[in-house]
Amino acid sequence: MLNLERLGLINFKNVYRNLPVAKLIEEAVKREEGVLVNNGAFNVYTGKYTGRSPNDKFIVDEPEVHEDIWWENNKPISVEKFEKLYNRLIAYLQNRDLFIFDGFVGADPQYRVSIRVITEYAYQSLMARQLFIRPTEKELQNFVPEYTLIAAPRFKAIPEIDGVNSEAFIILSFTKKLIIIGGTQYGGEIKKSIFTLMNYLMPKKGVLSMHCSANIGKDGDTALFFGLSGTGKTTLSADPERFLIGDDEHGWSERGIFNFEGGCYAKCINLSREKEPQIWDSIRFGAILENVVYDEATRELDYTSDKITENTRAAYPIDFIPGAVQSGIGGHPKTIIFLTADAFGVLPPIAKLTKEQAMYYFLSGYTSKLAGTERGITEPQATFSTCFGAPFLPLPPMVYAKMLGEKIEKYDTKVFLVNTGWSGGPYGIGKRINLEYTRKMVSAALKGELDKVEFTKDPIFNLNIPASCPGVPSEILNPRNTWKDKEEYDKTAKRLAQRFIENFQKYKEVSEEIKNAGPKG
């Protein structure tokens, strides 16, 4: 018995639960939700929402959770508004087919959460199946979901009545254990609202939830890669020498680390087999593509086209990646890499961090966005997203930072800051740091080869820079050396250091040791 009545779901037509991949694709094709393309993947156009819509995400302001939530970063909606909108959504689903995926989030059985995803589109059920953790036949028999997510993209909110900002909404009710999504078809909303849920639940169980990728070496040494979109998390953790645990969301418990998911959600703009063979080969029958341009006649994909969006995506199960760690579990991390793409060209390509510096750079969550070049603006913008994942944090940042500091200390984890951005000048003048060099620096950090080298202190950013690194020209390790105009470097570096200092002023409760670990300006 699915017991959908307890959710108020009645008078629905057919219910399709945990259908196999081929059947879900068959249903999706039949309903014209998308098309099969020449590599066997299922490609959908998601309409006007081709990315997440942070302005349309709300947390229900319930007395039981009010004190916990970081309201500076999360939008509240009243219980009354939520219930009215929920009842309209339930009424909308009457007389419609429903697709259900029952499964789990969290690969460690001790911490896993059972979820039910109810969708009106077959392909979104396939997406949930490929991204989350799939249950065994036995687990399905007595399955009871703790949390339920309902996604109905064709149901649109009315902002004036519903107290939301547009026709789209993503609303989490932690007390009712419900997530509802409407008006947007973008698959990332399903994935990231479940991540937000885990960011709420896990710290309460003593588990640090993290927006990072993870892999493991042949000797069983685990590494984590933190970084915002476009910094190289997926690319650098897909290393043929190492085995992928997961590409995006993990927990760190007393037992080690574990993937929250059972799949990957990779960016595919400009994807090529040469640069990213693992991702390229994973896009096949069973994978879902979002908003990739294709030729109607030949069904050939054009990964270079950003005609619909630059945020083109592929969702596929992790077992499509050769050598992926099937259990989704690893030991305590030996090394953590914070990735940043600095378009000002002033941060070193690699630096070793102390525990205090690790907390400082974790709370800062820095990268830079390139301004729209079509308007002739080439000045990059500094972006700070706390804990490298601000949009998904329901609790205050210090909750996560404190846990990170404690765990780094307890398990003696080494932390490095790696800049995958520009060198020799800012964006437009300098050039992007060679990916091969970045790979060599990451490899040296993971193998402990940087333990043996000398370090110099960067006077502006207060960072320890290695004097040498195997396979990397020493002159690029100190960014000042790569600039022709040293005065211009000093000015630019001080300007960015000042941005760090200004951004960090909001963390009033941070100790002096952590404050002093940051740039000096």
From Swiss-Prot:
Its EC number is 4.1.1.49. Involved in the gluconeogenesis. Catalyzes the conversion of oxaloacetate (OAA) to phosphoenolpyruvate (PEP) through direct phosphoryl transfer between the nucleoside triphosphate and OAA. Its cofactor is Mn(2+). Disulfide bonds: none annotated. Pathway: Carbohydrate biosynthesis; gluconeogenesis. NCBIfam families: pckA (TIGR00224), PRK09344.1-2 (NF006820), PRK09344.1-3 (NF006821). This is Phosphoenolpyruvate carboxykinase (ATP). Pfam families: PEPCK_ATP. GO terms for cellular component: cytosol. InterPro entries: PEP_carboxykinase_ATP, PEP_carboxykinase_C, PEP_carboxykinase_N, PEPCK_ATP_CS. Substrate binds at residues 52, 186, 192, 313. The keyword Manganese applies. Belongs to the phosphoenolpyruvate carboxykinase (ATP) family. One of its GO terms (molecular function) is ATP binding. It catalyses: oxaloacetate + ATP = phosphoenolpyruvate + ADP + CO2. It comes from the Bacteria.
